[in-house]
A protein has these predicted regions:
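Extended, hydrophobic/aromatic-rich amphipathic alpha-helical segments that build helical scaffolds
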Residues: 1-23, 38-49
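Short, contiguous acidic/charged loop-to-helix segments that flank catalytic cores in large enzymes
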Residues: 9, 30-31
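Long, intrinsically disordered, low-complexity segments
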Residues: 25, 32-105
Length: 105
C-alpha cells in the first residue's frame, strides 16, 4: 500500500511514479507498465481486491458516483452525495456547529 501511495503522490505532483508502482507489479510477477492514474487505479484494484478499499479509491479519483450510482437521480438531487456518509445524529446534537452532509436529512 505504501508503494502505491507513493506512486500516486508522485503522479499527482507531476513526477513519475513508475518505479514505486512497478515494484509492486514485479513482486507479483507482472510486467512493468507506465505509471498513469488510470493504471494506478487498476493496480490498486488488483492489489487490494478483498480489502475493501475500492470505494475509497473511486471517491478519491472522482469516479465513485459514475461507477455505482446507476439509478435515476431524484430531481434536484446531486448524484454525487453518496460519496459522503451521513454524520450520525448524536454527533450533530453534540456539536451544533456541524451541518449534515449534503443529501441527508
Amino acid at each position: 500500500d505504501v508503494l502505491l501511495m507513493k506512486a500516486e503522490a508522485q503522479l499527482r505532483s507531476g513526477h513519475d511514479g513508475s518505479i514505486a508502482m512497478n515494484l509492486v507489479r514485479n513482486r507479483a510477477g507482472m510486467a512493468s507498465l507506465p505509471a498513469t492514474l488510470s493504471n494506478l487505479l487498476d493496480e490498486r484494484l488488483l492489489e487490494f481486491m478483498w480489502e475493501g478499499w475500492r470505494r475509497n479509491d473511486l471517491i478519491r479519483f472522482g469516479l465513485f458516483h459514475k461507477a455505482y450510482d446507476l439509478r435515476q437521480p431524484i430531481e434536484g438531487e446531486s448524484s454525487a452525495f453518496t460519496t459522503l456518509f451521513p454524520i450520525p445524529t448524536n454527533v450533530l446534537k453534540l456539536n451544533l456547529n456541524l451541518k449534515q452532509n449534503p443529501g441527508y436529512k
